[in-house]
């Protein structure tokens, strides 16, 4: 987790990924992103909508290195960060998809595939649920995550 914190801190200087600018603040963000995971123990495959800095997807992947996790992020700079972090951390089971979740047209290959969907600060809960629903496999669930 410390390696991820270092990578995030380094990239955060160039492209704003998270609010905190120091390691302690980033560690707090990482721990905060894991709280729902620790309470609910998601099943896999997992889709993280609007992955941004990789929270909670990358910390979950660090704890479950063989878990099938897909990070969906629309912004190119952030997908570059995610690809770098995943490579640097050796998280070979994590995939990065550059694209938007859309209730009208989810990205190809994401429909009906996931047992769990996570997101942080993506949209209002109703909108987020509409985005997540098409991606969930029958019987799948999700963690909408806290909004700050």
PLM region descriptions:
Residues 60:
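Aromatic pocket-lining residues of Rossmann-like dinucleotide-binding sites
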């Amino acid at each position: 987790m410390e390696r991820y914190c270092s990578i995030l801190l380094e990239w955060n200087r160039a492209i704003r990924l998270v609010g905190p600018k120091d390691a302690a603040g980033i560690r707090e963000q990482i721990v905060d992103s894991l709280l729902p995971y620790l309470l609910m123990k998601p099943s896999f495959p997992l889709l993280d909508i609007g992955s941004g800095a990789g929270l909670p997807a990358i910390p979950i992947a660090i704890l479950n290195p063989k878990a099938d996790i897909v990070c969906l992020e629309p912004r190119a700079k952030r997908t570059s960060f995610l690809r770098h972090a995943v490579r640097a951390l050796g998280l070979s089971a994590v995939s990065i998809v550059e694209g938007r979740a859309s209730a009208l047209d989810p990205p190809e290959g994401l429909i009906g595939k996931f047992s769990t969907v996570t997101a942080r600060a993506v949209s209002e809960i109703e909108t987020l649920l509409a985005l997540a629903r098409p991606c969930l496999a029958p019987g799948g669930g999700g963690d909408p995550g806290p909004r700050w």
